[in-house]
Structures are given as C-alpha cells and as structure tokens.
C-alpha cells in the first residue's frame, strides 16, 4: 500500500522562487514523469496599479486551501503537490500564486493544477484591494463570473 501524499500548502508574505520550488518537489524522484506548474503574477491592465493588497484570515485560508489540495490528491494520482499563495502588498510583475503538480503522467498533473487554480481564483478566502499609482485606493476586487463558472466543471455529481 502506498503512502498518502501530504500536499505542501503555504500562505506567506515573502516572494518565492518558482524553479527552487519545482526542484524541491522533484529532487531525487524517479517516479515523477510530469510536472505542471502555474505561477500567477500581479497584472496591471490599465497602467494605473501600484500594488494589489491581498488580505486573508490566518488559519482559515490555510485550512481551505489544504482541503482543496487534499481533494486533488484524492482525485488524481499525484507524486507531489505544492501550493503557495502570497498575501500583503504585491506589485505588478511580482508572484502571487504557485501551483506545482507532479505525477507519473501529464494528464493527471495538468488536471490537478487546473482544478486547484480554478478553486483558488473563485473560492479561496482572500480579499484583494487595488492601490493606484495616483495614490488613491481602488475598490475591492471580486471574483469574475468566468472563474466561478470554470470551478463548477470540477463538481462531483454528489455536490
């Protein structure tokens, strides 16, 4: 019987190194045949954003993301899973989120990473506030309907 994979979930203020996180997940592993990573960056679409401030309720965010990461491990045959989400003020071009899924085969890794990102974009307990280059504060950013719809494709028939 194989050991149950414990996903790595971190909520942190500091930046992360994508290559280092992938290396940490795959170092010395001969059972991994595919690694899919998604790194989400802070984007400034109109040239007016100085920072995006992400707030979370400590404990709740880790528990919720841990729950969905555990569901990914149950649904797909993964050899490794890392989810990192930052909080605090994040400037355009900086990392916000990282999902790294490792599996023996690519389909499981791709699907698990997609599943996690759809969840993170629509239901993870983070609140985002825009800070503009003119010194003003923008509004709180809501989840997009397209993100909510994307997450619905993963619901099981029992939900």
UniProtKB/Swiss-Prot annotation:
<dbReference type="InterPro" id="IPR003448">
    <property type="entry name" value="Mopterin_biosynth_MoaE"/>
</dbReference>
<comment type="function">
    <text>Converts molybdopterin precursor Z into molybdopterin. This requires the incorporation of two sulfur atoms into precursor Z to generate a dithiolene group. The sulfur is provided by MoaD.</text>
</comment>
<feature type="binding site">
    <location>
        <begin position="105"/>
        <end position="106"/>
    </location>
    <ligand>
        <name>substrate</name>
    </ligand>
</feature>
<feature type="binding site">
    <location>
        <begin position="128"/>
        <end position="130"/>
    </location>
    <ligand>
        <name>substrate</name>
    </ligand>
</feature>
<comment type="pathway">
    <text>Cofactor biosynthesis; molybdopterin biosynthesis.</text>
</comment>
<feature type="region of interest" description="Disordered">
    <location>
        <begin position="130"/>
        <end position="159"/>
    </location>
</feature>
<comment type="similarity">
    <text>Belongs to the MoaE family.</text>
</comment>
<comment type="subunit">
    <text>Heterotetramer of 2 MoaD subunits and 2 MoaE subunits. Also stable as homodimer. The enzyme changes between these two forms during catalysis.</text>
</comment>
<dbReference type="GO" id="GO:0030366">
    <property type="term" value="F:molybdopterin synthase activity"/>
</dbReference>
<dbReference type="InterPro" id="IPR036563">
    <property type="entry name" value="MoaE_sf"/>
</dbReference>
<protein>
    <recommendedName>
        <fullName>Molybdopterin synthase catalytic subunit</fullName>
        <ecNumber>2.8.1.12</ecNumber>
    </recommendedName>
</protein>
<dbReference type="GO" id="GO:0006777">
    <property type="term" value="P:Mo-molybdopterin cofactor biosynthetic process"/>
</dbReference>
<feature type="binding site">
    <location>
        <begin position="41"/>
        <end position="43"/>
    </location>
    <ligand>
        <name>substrate</name>
    </ligand>
</feature>
<keyword id="KW-0501">Molybdenum cofactor biosynthesis</keyword>
<feature type="binding site">
    <location>
        <position position="121"/>
    </location>
    <ligand>
        <name>substrate</name>
    </ligand>
</feature>
<keyword id="KW-0808">Transferase</keyword>
<dbReference type="Pfam" id="PF02391">
    <property type="entry name" value="MoaE"/>
</dbReference>
């Amino acid at each position: 019987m194989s050991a149950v994979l414990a996903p790595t979930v971190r909520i942190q203020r500091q930046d992360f190194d994508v290559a280092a996180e992938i290396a940490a997940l795959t170092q010395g592993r001969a059972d991994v045949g595919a690694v899919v990573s998604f790194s989400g960056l802070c984007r400034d679409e109109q040239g007016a954003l100085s920072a995006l401030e992400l707030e979370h309720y400590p404990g709740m965010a880790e528990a919720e993301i841990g729950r969905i990461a555990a569901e990914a491990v149950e649904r797909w045959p993964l050899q490794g899973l890392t989810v990192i989400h930052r909080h605090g003020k994040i400037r355009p071009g900086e990392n916000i989120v990282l999902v790294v899924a490792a599996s023996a085969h690519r389909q499981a890794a791709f699907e698990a990473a997609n599943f996690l990102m759809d969840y993170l974009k629509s239901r993870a307990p983070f609140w985002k506030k825009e800070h503009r280059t003119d010194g003003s504060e923008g509004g709180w950013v809501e989840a997009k309907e397209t993100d909510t719809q994307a997450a619905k494709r993963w619901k099981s028939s029992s939900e």
